Amino acid sequence: MKQYDYLVVGAGLFGAVFARQAADAGKKVLVIDKRDHIAGNVYTEQVEGIHVHRYGAHIFHTNNKTVWDYITRFAEFNRFTNSPVANYKGELYSLPFNMYTFNKIWGVVTPEEAAAKIEEQRQEAGITEPHNLEEQAISLVGKDIYEKLIKGYTQKQWGRPCTELPAFIIKRLPVRLTFDNNYFNALYQGIPVGGYTQMVANLLDGIEVQLGVDYLADKEKLAATAERVV
């Protein structure tokens, strides 16, 4: 007879939620992770009283009330709203691109005016079907915004000219013809007040966790301990 019903590889969000659901269903679960901490890429640590996101900032956001009701069982969330601002040569511009951005650059005040300006610049560039990131960006927000707020940043990020980058990279870029600085268009959003690590610890409460264990380094032995590996 196997020692565990489930061996969960990875103590990130997926692994922790699966382990919680399995344990609540009466299953015996072991969670392992090759890192020396739980929470995967949403791991947060306290540095001088500040919750630092070691692997980059993560903002929880969803429109699904069932998901929200579930996750708030394990953490209290603040009402953090991500409203980035870009500084270009001393001028501040709202992100994601929205009517505040278009008003600052072109002086337009209605969605119709902004859409017309974008279309005008798209036609001036002769773009019908975008074939690279530059053409896709101009199609989405016009040449002025592309030159000021996209081109330099993107080329620095990827180390290649925008004309050599595929169009799909920027297709998910939020563009809104409304006065809305909220990066995520989601009903529920925020960051756990106690940090993501504490939230994941709450999810894993009462569940056996072993850190510093690399599944791929001893796959057969570890897999033999459980009925199923997740």
Regions found by a protein language model. Give the residues of each.
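N-terminal Rossmann-like FAD-binding beta1-loop-alpha1 element of flavoenzymes
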Residues: Y4-V31
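Glycine-rich FAD pyrophosphate-binding loop
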Residues: A23-E48
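Active-site/ligand-binding neighborhood in enzyme catalytic cores
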Residues: E91-Y93, Y100-A226
